[in-house]
Amino acid sequence: MNLQEMNARKEKIRNFSIIAHIDHGKSTLADRILEQTETVSKREMQAQLLDSMDLERERGITIKLNAIELNYKAKDGETYIFHLIDTPGHVDFTYEVSRSLAACEGAILVVDAAQGIEAQTLANVYLALDNDLEILPVINKIDLPAADPEMVRQEIEDVIGLDASEAVLASAKAGIGIEEILEQIVEKVPAPQGEVDAPLKALIFDSVYDAYRGVILQIRVIDGSVKVGDRIQLMSNGKEFDVTEVGIFTPKAVARDFLMAGDVGYVAAAIKTVADTRVGDTVTLASNPATEALEGYKEMNPMVFAGIYPIESNKFNDLREALEKLQLNDASLRFEPETSQALGFGFRCGFLGLLHMDVIQERLEREFGIDLIMTAPSVVYHINTTDGETLEVANPSEFPDPTRIENIEEPFVKAQIMVPNDFVGPVMELAQRKRGIFLTMDYLDANRVNIIYHIPLSEIVFDFFDKLKSSTKGYASFDYEISDYRPSNLVKMDILLNAEKVDALSFIVHKDFAFERGKVIVEKLKKLIPRQQFEVPIQATIGNKIVARSDIKALRKNVLAKCYGGDISRKRKLLEKQKAGKKRMKAIGSVEVPQEAFLSVLSMDEE
């Protein structure tokens, strides 16, 4: 292809993604677009084709990014090349959204005709606006009885400030309005900028590990072109690799001769470890490198940490391999080895949020068959010590001695909660209970309110979302971003079983709630830990002070069963003997702690 043909081809390219709140019909719309453009034959069509992980289909959420090339013959008789880049809609995966948006020029905003705009839709729209994308509103599910497209249209204009007069009314399920959406993409989404003959510059927006070909990079070529045999260089670390294959996805990988400016596709280059390829890095040619890297890429910092331990201690290396493999596809997962007296060897893992943590745990168990114990998630605290040091601690068992602590700062988030009018009371009550600080409240329309709070991340970490859903009958939607660190009156609480500290059960708690939390946990553990042959005291302590205690009574055999009538001194002798045996057992006995016990530290309801 000569330069002229390449430029003509570039004018026909449209790169776009679909933004939507969970369940507003994004994956279904993507399916319809694939059918309409005949990318996938009816025979291969399965619901949510782009959600290729089993877990995604089951939970009905999109986690990883998928990029697909489609050909669309428009009404003007020309054939256009569409690249549809699927984005996850869940708050934990905002970074994945931001990188897929960086690879696009346009975005389809899908809003449910019955539910209107939700908090996460807003968050993603702002990301799209930051990337200067052309946004095409689509009002989906207009065939629902409760649909009110006109109200939603007004809402898009009022809340986001987009002109929604030309918003397409669609039903992805019934296939209504799909043609219109495709025509709007042709007309409104700009063709890619970028020079075909400039030095290669391409953005990595995802990487997938393949056992045979090594790491496969998903890239959006901004300038230049790349073909098999080129030697590429990664700009963040200067490492070089030889390209062995380039191609596109039509969901299936199809090899091509080259990729040029505007294209979205994949490159395989015998890259052994995914650690070499950072998502958001810039790829260029070693022989003719670009002068500067693409901007807008940041390292993701995990916000939530938890210990992951294999139940069988000989599976430690399998767990390490499994985590390394997951990390190949998941740039935001961090882990380092740690040991616990109670649980043996395992890893401290960092996650973007709770859903991310859940998904990783499920994938470890499902794809690698490893049985795990997870400890309670915690956040990163900043501890200022009396000798002027600042420590960053994510694991409660690493907290320094209380006498050395000057003060502790914890991360706060700015939480945006959208909720129907009737539930404002319960939501505010919940936020206050979680130590939230009220900021503002805006009425979006006559019956929906947007409430903004500052809440400590540690309070959101375990059950805030579930509580929010149950106190608003599932109507609230919620989005948060990290705001800053603030000093808080926090203490570390340890749990002692049989007078031994179980490090995996330690947690950090606000001083005002310490007493009742201690009480709740001790009672919960009493129910969860099976009775032993000897009595087990459970104590909650802060420093050396015991704040709550409960005892698990011993199981005992009735040693008097074979004394009929019998002499009292004979009975006493047997009982004394039993007591001495129990005492010996208690001295050497260890207590088995079931997985539920670790999780009970999390679900700290005051029930």
UniProtKB/Swiss-Prot annotation:
Q: PROSITE patterns recorded for this chain?
A: G_TR_1, G_TR_2
Sorted alphabetically, the Gene Ontology cellular component annotations on this record are: plasma membrane
Q: Mind telling me which InterPro entries this protein's record contains?
A: EF-4, EFG_II, EFG_III/V, EFG_V-like, EFTu-like_2, G_TR_CS, LepA_C_sf, LepA_CTD
Tell me which UniProt keywords the record has, alphabetically.
Cell membrane, GTP-binding, Hydrolase, Membrane, Nucleotide-binding, Protein biosynthesis
EC number(s)? 3.6.5.n1
Q: Which reaction does it catalyse?
A: GTP + H2O = GDP + phosphate + H(+)
**Any one GO molecular-function label of the UniProt entry:** GTPase activity
- Where along this sequence does the record place binding of GTP? D23, H24, G25, K26, S27, T28, N140, K141, I142, D143
Any one Gene Ontology biological process term? positive regulation of translation
Q: Where in the cell is it found?
A: Cell membrane
* Family annotation (SUPFAM superfamilies): EF-G C-terminal domain-like, P-loop containing nucleoside triphosphate hydrolases, Translation proteins
Q: Start and end of every tr-type G domain?
A: 11-193
Which Pfam families does the record associate with it? Answer: EFG_C, EFG_III, GTP_EFTU, GTP_EFTU_D2, LepA_C
Give the way it sits in the membrane: Peripheral membrane protein
Q: Which family does it belong to?
A: Belongs to the TRAFAC class translation factor GTPase superfamily. Classic translation factor GTPase family. LepA subfamily.
Job of this protein:
Required for accurate and efficient protein synthesis under certain stress conditions. May act as a fidelity factor of the translation reaction, by catalyzing a one-codon backward translocation of tRNAs on improperly translocated ribosomes. Back-translocation proceeds from a post-translocation (POST) complex to a pre-translocation (PRE) complex, thus giving elongation factor G a second chance to translocate the tRNAs correctly. Binds to ribosomes in a GTP-dependent manner.
> What HAMAP family does this protein map onto?
LepA
What is the designated name of this protein?
Elongation factor 4
